[in-house]
Every structure is written in C-alpha cells, then in structure tokens.
A protein has these predicted regions:
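Membrane-embedded catalytic scaffold of the fatty acid hydroxylase/desaturase
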Residues: 1-144
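Cytosolic-facing loops and C-terminal tails of multi-pass membrane proteins
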Residues: 141-193
Length: 193
C-alpha cells in the first residue's frame, strides 16, 4: 500500500506538472484554476477531459506490476486528500508542511501571484516539489485564478477558452514546427516566438 501511494503520487506530480506546462494538457486543466475563489467547490471544478488525459500516465501502474484494485483504491484515497486542500479555513499545519501537500501548499498552487506560478504540483506528498525545485511556501496573500482571468461564469466557455486560443494560434502558425508547438508547447507560447 505504501509503495502504491508513493508511486501514484510521483506519477501524479509529473502528470500535474505537465498539465501546467504543455498547452493541450493546460487546455484540459485550466478550468480548475480559473476560479478566483478558493473553497471546496473548486475541487469539483474538474476538467471534462481530465480522466482521458490521465490514462497514459496512470496505466503505468498495472503495467509495472501494481495490483489494479489496490491502485484504484489508493487513487481514490489520494484524490479525497486533494479535495481537502481546497480551503482557506485551515491555516498552516506545523511539521506536516514538510511532508504533505497541505491546504497552505495547495493555496500557493492555485495562486496567480508571480512567485506562486508553477509551484506545488504534488497531491499527497510535498517532497516531489522540494526535490524537483517547484516548492514555494505561502508567504504573501494568494491571488486566485489564472494570469488572464476568464470574464465569464459559463462553464462551456471556460472549458473551451484555451482550446479556441490554441486553434487560433494553429491557424496563424506559419511552420510545421509552430503548428505542432500550438499543442505541445508551453501554455504562454505563441507562434513565431
């Protein structure tokens, strides 16, 4: 069980990091970060296509020998822990801040403050962020949302906003390389850059 939790969390860290750094994965994940509030409802604001994009990452578990039932159970428990991180009610948790992704660490992850962008990708263990240099402590007041906040509460518009941006970039791209980067480049990337 312990090895299953650690492995799931390690894979989740990389899946989540890619979801912030690869355009088409950001298009899937962006609506979760578009809320300018932080509460438990944000945990429910999940990507419509998220389960599909997780398959290539998490199919590794049974392929390398982990029991699928134990993997699924550990995944559910890990997800429930992630839900608890979406709150402002719980402040800092002392020594647990060094081991677990606490609500404080996850608030940082949802911040659009410059010092908080692309930080704290872990779900259960904060150690991956510490090891891979993506950790940040909650120091300043967190400004929630994305850099260019959406100006709507319409879930369909929020879900497809970045897909439309990618399509427009694709239409304007001059080279094959730029057309490919429209989907696999960094979210802030634009053609001819």
């Amino acid at each position: 069980w312990v090895l299953t939790f650690v492995t799931i969390d390690f894979i989740y860290y990389w899946y989540h990091r890619c979801s912030h750094r690869v355009r088409f994965l950001w298009a899937v994940h962006m609506n979760h970060h578009s809320s300018e509030e932080m509460n438990f409802s944000v945990a429910l604001r999940q990507a419509w296509f998220g389960p599909i994009t997780k398959i290539p990452f998490f199919m590794l578990m049974p392929l390398i020998g982990f029991d699928p039932i134990i993997t699924a159970a550990a995944g559910i428990i890990s997800t429930l822990w992630g839900v608890l991180g979406h709150t402002q009610w719980i402040k800092r948790l002392g020594l647990l801040e060094y081991i677990l992704v606490t609500p404080s660490a996850h608030r940082v992850h949802h911040g659009s403050n410059e010092e908080y962008i692309d930080k704290n990708y872990g779900n259960l263990l904060i150690v991956w962020d510490r090891i891979f240099g993506t950790f940040a402590n909650e120091k300043n007041k967190v400004v929630y949302g994305i850099i260019d906040n959406v100006q709507t509460f319409n879930p369909v518009k929020i879900t497809f906003q970045f897909w439309i941006t990618m399509y427009r970039d694709y239409k304007n791209a001059k080279s094959l390389k730029d057309k490919i980067l429209c989907f696999v480049g960094r979210p802030e990337w634009k053609p001819d850059q």
